[in-house]
Amino acid sequence: QINYISIKISGIYAQITPLNYEHNKAELIKRLSAIFRKAIEFPYKDENDFLRPKFVNLDMEEYKDTRLTLDVYKATLNLPEFKNYTAGIVVQTYLPDAWSFQTELLDFAHKRVMNGGAHLKMRLVKGANLAMETVMSSLKGWENPVYDNKIDVDANYLKLLDRALLPDNASVMHIGVASHNLFTIAYAHLLSKRYQVETFLSFEMLEGMANYLPRVLKSINKQIILYTPV
């Protein structure tokens, strides 16, 4: 049975336009709320036969939609009916703005938990649209919104991961390490052990890619999420 889905705002509303931000936001909140309600209405049974709401993760796309995605995520989860529901969101570390986005999400999660709400989850990815963002910004004469080399992207990933795994942060915003890089995975594993936050960490990979990695992680009882298109 399905217990976890990942969606994008363009997948639930195709008429997004920067010229009508408030309308886009209101429509997306309405549609994301409907998905959250169904996730709660049709729970799954975990390994101990407890019923739990299905998990919904809000993915990121182009840089131009990042602010809208963040605002929709926070506004929807601020609705009273979702106070006790846990949902996730992606942060792309190929964006220099990723640090400020993470800061915003951590502040939101801390306030939410302090007021009696459920914890949330942040899925750290490096980003899949680096070439497209670079070409698009060049064609339009805009400043490039992404780092232009892999070293900076990788360093930013570890920088955000360091802060995400701090005990006070990890307890209110769990972490999904989305990577097939052995160094990144080992780094996250060892750092989570040092901070004693292993229960707040999951490793997320694509089904069928580097199959030895999930096998090894499973052998040492790590939480693993495998993504596959449906």
Language-model features, listed with the residues they occupy:
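Positively charged, amphipathic and often flexible ligand-engagement surfaces
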Residues: 1-230
